[in-house]
Curated annotation (Swiss-Prot):
Subunit structure comment from the entry: Found in a complex composed of CDH1, RAP1A and PKP3; PKP3 acts as a scaffold protein within the complex, the complex is required for CDH1 localization to mature desmosome cell junctions. Interacts with FXR1; the interaction facilitates the binding of PKP3 to PKP2 mRNA. Interacts (via ARM repeats) with GSK3B; the interaction may be involved in PKP3 protein degradation. Interacts with hyperphosphorylated and hypophosphorylated RB1; the interaction inhibits RB1 interaction with and repression of the transcription factor E2F1, potentially via sequestering RB1 to the cytoplasm.
ARM repeats: from-to residues: 305-348, 351-390, 393-432, 449-487, 491-536, 596-637, 645-684, 689-730
Protein name: Plakophilin-3
Required for interaction with GSK3B, as annotated region: 294-724
Chain positions covered by the region annotation Required for binding to PKP2 mRNA: 516-797
């Protein structure tokens, strides 16, 4: 049996040969005993042995004055090292806590009693001690509740703490000190959209209680700034857990090497990489002196050859930012790592430190380390830059001016997930600056698509099976970067549409997420928002040749032709003629590729089905559904023929109206903008307005305010709702009847008379137009008067 699979008992034996293993049923000749009674007796015997053993341990700990058993006590008992043949020499039952200090691992806890349900002969391993060790370094007593940015007290144990990344197993412990912190999901909140048909980005000041790593989570489509509690993925771990950032881990590694030189406990199959010994103060000064940059290290004269500095005995608290910047120019990679880690730590949330670092020329020196021969230096340099430019426009400009974009794209070619996470995070941070978006789009789109989007979406090769955690974060950062760029200028949108493979990668990823049930994923949200933004003003910005093809190659739309120009055997009111528009729409699908590529996806009939699936299946992430509705609003907007074709396709083939109305019932104001805008477009192009009126009118009237105290949606939503009702009332008497029946007149009159702001003026004018059209139904005048309304209410100012 391999050592990694050998499970030791957590109950410490009295002597070296003691064991709590029970005789087998064969040995007791109880194989054929009465089943339940035999199990009960065996469980009772186990409980008695456990209780007696715990009592002995409790007495022994009180007698010794401590619950810890040191190595000398172990040897005094004469525990034979070679008793268990499956164990290697030096492994003891106390080493399973994975701590570096053998004397502080096992802490027996006296428990009063145990029921048969809580103990058995197979439950001997008590993990309480192991949990206590790990919790001390993940939000526990070692750092308290201050988080990463707080002051780090002196850890009680002299050995290096077990980090959050080490708990995942041997594979995740390979790069213990160089792993960058996994960015957690930002939660959504409220941010007003300025446009009804374009996704916008989040303000740089957006904050979250789950933002354990400082960088811009800029987002489009009205993404918000509230805490992360309303996004379910943010609750993967305990909310109170403190996660140490890479800079803190590096500083603590150097600190740990100064405090203790003791060996760590054996870990089965751990395979930890040997960590280079932290340089002494003398080696620091000599190395920097060789390079011509001698730092001002306080207390240097107090150094002796056999002890470290007393001022540094508690860690590297005496390092300042100027010294850390000078370390970046050292020839020793250890010094460069230390300097970058300190800058990363200081610039986490300190605006003054970011400004000071820029004045000390930290930005150009970090850029030179992006493609260093030592990968650990690369990781810490990019991690430091990621914090340095967060919410700091001047540092972003300095990075771009130092040819940082070119160096970042070179680094992106490295096959190291930690580096790629940092690089894509830096690009996302840069994209939050409006004046950098056009340049970023020009310099990065093609390489980012080839190196990240296509491989990780499955569009550029074999089908995507599943992304690992690092790949998921890399793709998330990349789509967040695109989400910001897509909300920029028309030229940037056009460049993104024409970028080979970009739209294909996004559509492929969304389809895959829907197939595997991950439509709530934040990367899906980013991808849908990008498609929404790229669909903005699509028919005005698309290639003329494609637009001509969508308009029917010069063929007249029979639905809009005057009756006198119709040639054929059918009268204008015949059933055959009414069916012609549907046939014409079906024929136009032959003019669109059945296998769309690139920007063809944006107006393809297949994309309507994709958005409809998102509306039906995405229940939790409201930003995804808002973006899907906004994208449909974009491609059905305007007077273009193809907008009408896609509107009728959504209504008649995709049956999208019921999912939309379900969303309207529970939608917030941001969602209502997109949903009501889409329904407005559909109501213009619907063939059967009577059927649509029966489904829509009652739901929309519920959203209208009828008095001063009632909750009122934004003016833009009110205008959309009134426009939908107007489109239906003009063509359908059923809509006028339902509007009267569901008390819509009272609400419309209230909106018409409310003119206390510029926004309410817009909704008042819309209500006046609708009331005037209602008065045209003379058969309803008696019903109007019966409810107390006069002609002046409909036609008056």
């Amino acid at each position: 049996m391999q050592e990694g699979n050998f499970l030791l008992s957590a109950l410490q034996p009295e002597t070296g040969v003691c064991s709590l293993a029970l005789p087998s049923d064969l040995q007791l000749d109880r194989r054929g005993a009465e089943g339940p009674e035999a199990d009960r007796l065996r469980a009772a015997r186990v409980q008695e042995q456990v209780r007696a053993r715990l009592l002995q341990l409790g007495q022994q700990s009180r007698h010794n004055g401590s619950a810890e058993l040191d190595g000398s006590a172990e040897s005094a008992r004469g525990m034979p090292r070679g008793q268990y043949h499956t164990m290697q020499t030096g492994f003891s039952s106390r080493s399973q806590g994975m701590s570096g200090d053998k004397t502080s691992t096992f802490r027996p806890i006296a428990k009063p009693a145990y029921s048969p349900a809580s103990w058995s002969s197979r439950s001997a391993v008590d993990l309480t001690c192991s949990r206590r060790l790990s919790s001390a370094h993940n939000g526990g007593s070692a750092f308290g509740a201050v988080g990463y940015g707080g002051t780090q007290p002196t850890p009680p144990m002299p050995t290096r703490p077990v980090s959050f990344h080490e708990r995942g197993g041997a594979a995740s412990r390979a790069d213990y000190d160089t792993l960058s912190l996994r960015s957690l999901r930002l939660g959504p909140g409220g941010l007003d959209d300025r446009y009804s048909v374009v996704s916008e980005q989040l303000e740089p000041a957006a904050a979250s209680t789950y933002r354990a790593y400082a960088y811009e989570r800029q987002a489009s489509s009205g993404s918000s700034r509230a805490g992360g509690l309303d996004w379910p993925e943010a609750t993967e771990g305990p909310p109170s857990r403190t996660i140490r950032a890479p800079a803190m881990r590096t500083l603590q590694r150097f600190q740990s090497s100064h405090r203790s030189r003791g060996g760590t406990g054996s870990v089965s199959g751990a395979g930890l990489e040997p960590v280079a010994r932290a340089p002494s103060v003398r080696s620091l000064s000599l190395s920097l002196a060789d390079s011509g940059h001698l730092p001002d290290v306080r207390g240097l004269d107090s150094y002796t050859g056999h002890r470290t500095l007393q001022r540094l005995s508690s860690g590297f608290d005496d390092i300042d930012l100027p010294s850390a910047v000078k370390y970046l120019m050292a020839s020793d990679p250890n010094l460069q790592v230390l300097g970058a880690a300190y800058i990363q730590h200081r610039c986490y949330s300190d605006a003054a430190a970011k400004k000071q670092a820029r004045s000390l020329q930290a930005v150009p020196r970090l850029v030179k380390l992006f493609n260093h021969a030592n990968q650990e230096v690369q990781r810490h340099a990019t991690g430091a830059m990621r914090n340095l430019i967060y919410d700091n426009v001047d540092n972003k400009l300095a990075l771009v001016e130092e040819n940082g974009i070119f160096e970042l794209l070179r680094t992106l070619r490295e096959q190291d997930d930690e580096l790629r996470k940092n690089v894509t995070g830096i690009l996302w941070n840069l994209s939050s600056s409006d004046h950098l978006k056009d340049r970023l789009a020009r310099d990065t789109l093609e390489q980012l698509t080839d190196l990240v989007l296509s491989p990780l979406s499955g569009a550029g090769g074999p089908p995507l099976i599943q992304q690992n955690a690092s790949e998921a974060e890399i793709f998330y950062n990349a789509t967040g970067f695109l989400r910001n760029l897509s909300s920029a200028s028309q030229a940037t949108r056009q460049k993104m549409r024409e970028c080979h493979g970009l739209v294909d990668a996004l559509v492929t990823y969304i389809n895959h997420a829907l197939d595997v049930g991950k439509c709530e994923d934040k990367s899906v949200e980013n991808a849908v928002c990008v498609l929404r933004n790229l669909s903005y003003r699509l028919y005005d910005e698309m290639p003329p040749s494609a637009l001509q093809r969508l308009e029917g190659r010069g063929r007249r739309d029979m639905a809009g032709a005057p009756p006198g120009e119709m040639v054929g055997c059918f009268t204008p009111q015949s059933r055959r003629l009414r069916e012609l528009p549907l046939t014409a729409d079906a024929l136009t699908f032959a003019e669109v590729s059945k296998d769309p590529k690139g920007l063809e996806w944006l107006w393809s009939p297949q994309i309507v089905g994709l958005y409809n699936r998102l509306l039906q299946r995405c229940e939790l992430n409201r930003h995804t559904t808002e973006a899907a509705a906004g994208a449909l609003q974009n491609i059905t907007a305007g007077d273009r023929r193809w907008a009408g074709v896609l509107s009728r396709l959504a209504l008649e083939q995709e049956r999208i109206l019921n999912p939309l109305l379900d969303r309207v019932r529970t939608a917030d104001h941001n969602q209502l903008r997109s949903l009501t805008g889409l329904i407005r477009n559909l109501s213009r192009n619907a063939r059967n307005k009577d059927e649509m009126s029966t489904k829509v009118v009652s739901h929309l009237i519920e959203k209208l305010p009828g008095s001063v105290g009632e909750k009122c949606p934004p003016a833009e939503v009110l205008v959309n709702i009134i426009a939908v009702l107007n489109n239906l009332v003009v063509a359908s008497p059923i809509a006028a009847r339902d509007l009267l029946y569901f008390d819509g007149l009272r609400k419309l009159v209230f909106i018409k008379k409310k003119r206390d702001s510029p926004d309410s003026e817009k909704s008042s004018r819309a209500a006046s137009s609708l009331l005037a059209n209602l008065w045209q139904y003379s058969k309803l005048h008696r019903d109007f008067r019966a409810k107390g309304y006069r002609k002046e209410d409909f036609l008056g100012p």
